[in-house]
């Protein structure tokens, strides 16, 4: 695979290899055949980041080869949304001959939605001033004249200039209901929107008929919490990043959801609070003991769950675990399988043509 060519004819073979690999990794814990969720074969990534290479009068997007570290010119990127591909061409054309916009530009980040909204961030090794803003506004207007629904942002050290706004609102059809998700630039969002829809619908399916409340750690912008709220009496969710918490609060209101409470704290701190190890001012007015959480949902970073959180989640009758790294999932399962058994197993092909696998497991207490 090269950045400008996807081996779409190999899609089925690479997916089959992942299924075999996941089954092999999960064999010590389950003999289930994974439920398999396919990605679109191209244009599946809703966000992408590129370094910008200056070559005389020319400049272009590049990425670095992960093995050799050599740079690779990228003029089109079929893994990314069609809108990102349009914007890549339009941004280079708009910046190339503009000395103010191109000077010390070193990176461009793209974030798009299924409804063709975009936020494009230009990153600089220089101070941004009013002259930069004027030129950026002219570029934005020129892009919009091409029917590109785009918001531009300039970034430099300790500086962020959003010409209009620094977010876009994604709308996803989830099990017969449209969900609105505010996505803020430079914050985590699920990169593959089609796969995100399938993950959310799978999570809804495996939690059908749930009793009591749901606890979620690492909730981000509320991606899972809000979709799952319809299956539970109440949802209590934690997140540490301020922009994500703000987006989650917006999403709660935008979706008219009244049974989700977001707390800004790390999973490790929340574990301490739940265990009564220490008190937190941020929890004033929230009666943790009033929640009857029968299910806990975790979607941890690649490092997986730390040992304290492992112990904490074992206290819950049901654990729903979405993993972006099956190796750390299996490491966690060495502990979790002492008290819980795997009831459902899913493979989500988040990043086709790569080694990467995303998977989901539902665990129930033995």
From Swiss-Prot:
> Where is the catalytic site?
324 (nucleophile), 358 (proton acceptor)
Asked if the keyword tRNA processing belongs to this entry, the reply reads yes
All disulfide bonds of the chain are none
> Which PROSITE patterns is this protein grouped with?
SAM_MT_RNA_M5U (PS51687), TRMA_1 (PS01230), TRMA_2 (PS01231)
Q: SUPFAM superfamilies of this UniProt entry?
A: S-adenosyl-L-methionine-dependent methyltransferases
Uppermost EC category: transferase
- The reply to whether Protease figures as a keyword in the UniProt entry is no
Q: Name one GO molecular function term.
A: rRNA binding
Q: Where does S-adenosyl-L-methionine bind?
A: 190, 218, 223, 239, 299
Which catalytic reaction applies to this protein? Answer: uridine(54) in tRNA + S-adenosyl-L-methionine = 5-methyluridine(54) in tRNA + S-adenosyl-L-homocysteine + H(+); uridine(341) in tmRNA + S-adenosyl-L-methionine = 5-methyluridine(341) in tmRNA + S-adenosyl-L-homocysteine + H(+)
Listed under GO biological process in this entry are:
tRNA methylation
Keyword line: Methyltransferase, S-adenosyl-L-methionine, Transferase, tRNA processing
CC per GO annotation: cytosol
EC number(s) on record? 2.1.1.-, 2.1.1.35
Q: Which family does it belong to?
A: Belongs to the class I-like SAM-binding methyltransferase superfamily. RNA M5U methyltransferase family. TrmA subfamily.
Purpose of the protein: Dual-specificity methyltransferase that catalyzes the formation of 5-methyluridine at position 54 (m5U54) in all tRNAs, and that of position 341 (m5U341) in tmRNA (transfer-mRNA).
Protein name per UniProt? tRNA/tmRNA (uracil-C(5))-methyltransferase
Q: Which organism is it from?
A: Escherichia coli O6:H1 (strain CFT073 / ATCC 700928 / UPEC)
């Amino acid at each position: 695979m090269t950045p400008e060519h996807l081996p779409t004819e190999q899609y089925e073979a690479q997916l089959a290899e992942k299924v075999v690999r996941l089954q092999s990794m999960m064999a010590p814990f389950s003999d289930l055949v994974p439920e398999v969720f396919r990605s679109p074969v191209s244009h599946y990534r809703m966000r992408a980041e590129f370094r910008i290479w200056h070559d005389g009068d020319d400049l272009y997007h590049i990425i670095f080869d992960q093995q050799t570290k050599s740079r690779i010119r990228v003029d089109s990127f079929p893994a990314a949304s069609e809108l990102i591909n349009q914007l890549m061409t339009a941004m280079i054309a708009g910046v190339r001959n503009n000395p103010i916009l191109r000077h010390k530009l070193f990176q461009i980040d793209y974030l798009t939605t299924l409804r063709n909204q975009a936020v494009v961030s230009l990153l600089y090794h220089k101070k941004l001033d009013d002259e930069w803003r004027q030129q950026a506004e002219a570029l934005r207007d020129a892009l919009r004249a091409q029917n590109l629904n785009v918001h531009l942002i300039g970034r430099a050290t300790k500086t962020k200039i959003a010409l209009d706004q620094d977010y876009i609102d994604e709308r996803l059809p989830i099990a017969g209901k449209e969900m609105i998700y505010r996505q803020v630039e430079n914050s985590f969002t699920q990169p593959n929107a089609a796969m995100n829809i399938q993950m959310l619908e799978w999570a809804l399916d495996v939690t059908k008929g749930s009793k009591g409340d749901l606890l979620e750690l690492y909730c981000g912008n509320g991606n899972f919490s809000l979709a799952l709220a319809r299956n539970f009496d109440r949802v209590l969710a934690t997140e540490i990043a301020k922009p994500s918490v703000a987006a989650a609060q917006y999403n709660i209101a935008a979706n008219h959801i009244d049974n989700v409470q977001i707390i800004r704290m790390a999973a490790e701190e929340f574990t301490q609070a739940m265990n009564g190890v220490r008190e937190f001012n941020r929890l004033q007015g929230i009666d943790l003991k009033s929640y009857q959480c029968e299910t806990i949902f975790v979607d941890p970073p690649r490092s997986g769950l730390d040992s304290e959180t492992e112990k904490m989640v074992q206290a819950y009758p049901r654990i729903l675990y979405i993993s972006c790294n099956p190796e750390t999932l299996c490491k966690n399962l060495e502990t979790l399988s002492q008290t819980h058994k795997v009831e459902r197993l899913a493979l989500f092909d988040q990043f086709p043509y790569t080694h990467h696998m995303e998977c989901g497991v539902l665990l129930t207490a033995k």
